[in-house]
Amino acid sequence: ANTKGDGEKSGEDFWVKAEKLYYTALIGYIWYEAPDEEKNFTTLLEMINASEAREDDEDFQNPVDLMFERLEEKDPEHFAVKQYKKYKLAAGKTAKSILISCGARLAPFDIKELRELMETDEMELDTIGDRKTALFVIISDTDDTFNFVVSILYTQLFNLLCDKADDVYGGRLPVHVRCLLDEFANIGQIPKFEKLIATIRSREISASIILQSQSQLKAIYKDNADTIVGNCDTTLFLGGKEKTTLKEISEILGKETIDSFNTSETRGRELSHGLNYQKLGKELMTQDEIAVMDGGKCILQLRGVRPFFSDKFDITKHPKYKYLSDADPKNAFDM
């Protein structure tokens, strides 16, 4: 149960951990005790809604308390029971605050359509590496209200595929899974992505991170942004004006050696001439040169080789371009 959202302050750490403890207890109960048809997010929400804590009555028991009491009688060493007893160490006022925090964080799931989305597994994410599959995740580029759902999806996808690669296929999926993460900055933070990007490749999984600028990545992943970039074997720059990106691309390109000749002439009683020769280092492309790069050009950096300055691919020359709606409006896919 990962409950830590963006912008959590160190002073709020107690409440985040308390929420996580409570979620862990409830999810443990659902996982081990609930029937298969109730092992879903909706059951978790219903259990939270059935929870209640009273400041003036420490002995009050809500329906969830009674459920765990019966479970403890049956199995005192049950994982969920141990987690719940830790949560119950909180006094009535503290427990009430924890429940309010849970309710506030999960408020979006009060929307009926979102609950229904979480009730059943219709996507079978764990089968994507078994056969050729195309999964389109379409999100709004102006409203980020539900971007956290996409973040949950990607987290689940990577975890399921890595587990299946290890447990079923001996470490590598039979069909390569390529994740084209367009507008990566808009899907929210994927927990531990800086570690995933380094380990998924061995499972036959790759990720293409598409950003408007490097600063977008740093805004979301902070110090881990450099780790993420460092684990990408290929960098493709299509153009841009953001200063941080221009600086990093210029540094990646390195320097070239130029020959410098300086001549001097001194006039006096006698005329003398001087010639000075030296080798100097100059950026292969300066930041201002990259900023005004022709729109039809791109820079490609592959690990282990020098960068390429190349023409962008003309998509109209692709053999399957005729199937796109750009080529023929009749091909437009209406959802």
Identify the function of each model-found stretch.
Residues 1-205, 220, 230, 279-283, ...:
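P-loop NTPase motor domains
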